[in-house]
């Protein structure tokens, strides 16, 4: 192996360097902290249920404004359901009476202790997540200073809804300044997911000569097993690639949209199943991601109707080709509407 590598016959593995390696480390640390905070939320919900306090059933997000106010009041010693329900935020859908009925519990000391500890650990995780956000923002600014890519005008955002557990700064603007393109214009890629992809793959994709090399590295391309000139299997190989997992999440999201990628996912899902449709759609998103970073290509979605029209054209061309090979000619039939008799 060493001899082959010495003569340049082996392709090097991809390892991020410099600031990209630091960005990836900060993002992975932040992800671990978010997962840890989620486990502490579950501990709080368990403590509330053991005290028969069902506030998490009437408040959509227990870690929202209303939920946190109530939890902090309980931890500081408040037990009156009326006083606790008065912490309701005006945007909360449940009324004060509903919240008050859900705040009648047994208030056992051991469960209150577990609730207090879980809340303290959750707050500690949030503080560490905020520290990670500062490190990530500073790293992106250093990468921007090293970048020589021309930056045009940032296009309007497709969605202004804030994602849960999003970083505490404008990711779209920061990534656009670094990359020169807006990755969030690709359907399925939100700001947080685009940031994680850049952290895993870097800003320079020249390590992969083509999009086919890139999708093969991700484990999203068919892994053909050939014996005697015959393809025995073309299943994708098993891979623990984090970027591939992110792209699969994007594929599931885009499958619910009225876009060309969404129409492709739904048509393939009905034919070969959801698992293969997710992989195939993830591969398409990976190609768009590669072309955007490597060649600076902007993505404009043609829409689901355009995809369906192109699909019908391909089916018709295939039928015409098969008919011609058999000595027939396809002719469009004028089908008159059926007459409806009235008795």
Indicate residue ranges for each PLM-predicted region.
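A detector of single, family-specific signature residues
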Residues: 1-343
């Amino acid at each position: 192996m060493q001899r082959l590598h010495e003569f340049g016959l082996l392709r090097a593995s991809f390892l991020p360097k410099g600031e990209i390696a630091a960005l990836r480390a900060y993002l992975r640390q932040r992800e671990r902290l978010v997962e840890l905070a989620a486990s502490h939320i579950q501990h709080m919900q368990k403590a509330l249920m053991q005290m028969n306090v069902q506030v998490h059933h009437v408040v959509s997000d227990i870690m929202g404004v209303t939920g946190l106010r109530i939890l902090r009041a309980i931890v500081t010693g408040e037990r009156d359901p009326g006083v606790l329900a008065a912490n309701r935020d005006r945007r909360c859908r449940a009324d004060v009476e509903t919240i008050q009925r859900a705040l009648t519990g047994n208030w056992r000391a051991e469960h209150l202790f577990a609730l207090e500890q879980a809340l303290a650990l959750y707050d500690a995780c949030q503080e560490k997540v905020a520290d990670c956000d500062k490190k990530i923002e500073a790293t992106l600014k250093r990468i921007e200073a090293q970048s020589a890519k021309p930056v045009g005008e940032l296009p309007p955002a497709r969605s202004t809804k804030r994602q849960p557990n999003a970083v505490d700064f404008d990711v779209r603007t920061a990534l656009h300044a670094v990359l020169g393109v807006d990755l969030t214009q690709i359907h399925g890629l939100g700001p947080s997911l685009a940031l994680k992809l850049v952290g895993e793959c870097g800003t320079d994709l020249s390590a992969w000569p083509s999009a086919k090399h890139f999708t093969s590295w991700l484990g999203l391309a068919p892994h053909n097993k050939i014996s005697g000139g015959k393809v025995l299997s073309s299943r994708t190989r098993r891979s623990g690639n984090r970027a591939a997992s992110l792209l699969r999440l994007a594929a599931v999201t885009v499958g619910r949209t009225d876009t060309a990628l969404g129409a492709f996912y739904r048509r393939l899902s009905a034919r070969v199943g959801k698992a293969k449709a997710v992989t195939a759609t993830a591969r398409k998103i990976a190609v768009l991601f590669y072309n955007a970073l490597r060649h600076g290509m902007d993505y404009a979605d043609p829409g689901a109707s355009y995809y369906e029209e192109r699909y019908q054209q391909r089916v018709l061309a295939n039928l015409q080709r098969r008919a011609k090979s058999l000595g027939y000619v396809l002719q469009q039939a004028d089908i008159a509407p059926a007459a409806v008799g009235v008795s």
